[in-house]
Regions:
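Short, positively charged and aromatic/hydrophobic N-terminal segments
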Residues: 1-6, 13-20
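Proline-rich intrinsically disordered, low-complexity coils
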Residues: 2-8, 24, 42
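Structured catalytic core of nucleotide-sugar glycosyltransferases
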Residues: 13, 22-146
Length: 146
């Protein structure tokens, strides 16, 4: 019996060795579930990269971006691949079909290597600037920040 395309589920298509830790030894993982985000993903990446650069300076932290393509029908996966080729901090996971946002978040959390892990939607409904405040709140002693 031939393999179905569903055997790809949960398989990461890139190498995780590029993830490093900054001067403070802190790695921040940003898990981004994506479904048909071809228009918003480049904008999200641009905005999140700005914040990552600021936090690398302010906190001495390194970032990894984990884009989880949840079986998109548009160019979301191709865009994630392009971002990975241009930026070693970018990783991606591709599902063979749509399994839902929760499955995407779970796969991203399992793949995350960071000391801190945040999830954020690619549609920019959440303020990307909140990342800095969230890390500060966590470092102030909170167990969970949202």
């Amino acid at each position: 019996m031939p393999k179905t395309v569903e055997t790809r589920v949960g398989v990461c298509y890139n190498d995780f060795k590029y993830c490093t830790k900054g001067e403070t030894g802190m790695l921040i993982s940003l898990v981004v579930p994506c479904y048909n985000e071809e228009e918003s993903l480049p904008i999200f990446y641009k905005e999140a990269s700005k914040i990552a650069q600021q936090m690398e300076i302010s906190h001495g932290a390194d970032f990894e971006f984990i884009f989880v393509d949840d079986g998109s029908k548009d160019r979301t996966l191709q865009i994630a691949r392009e971002l990975h080729r241009k930026d070693a901090r970018v990783r991606y996971i591709s599902f063979s079909r749509n399994f839902g946002k929760e499955a995407g978040i779970y796969a991203g959390l399992k793949a995350a290597k960071g000391d801190y892990v945040a999830t954020m939607d690619a549609d920019l409904q959440d303020d990307v600037d909140a990342m800095d405040r969230m890390i500060d709140a966590y470092e102030a002693g909170n167990d969970i920040v949202y």
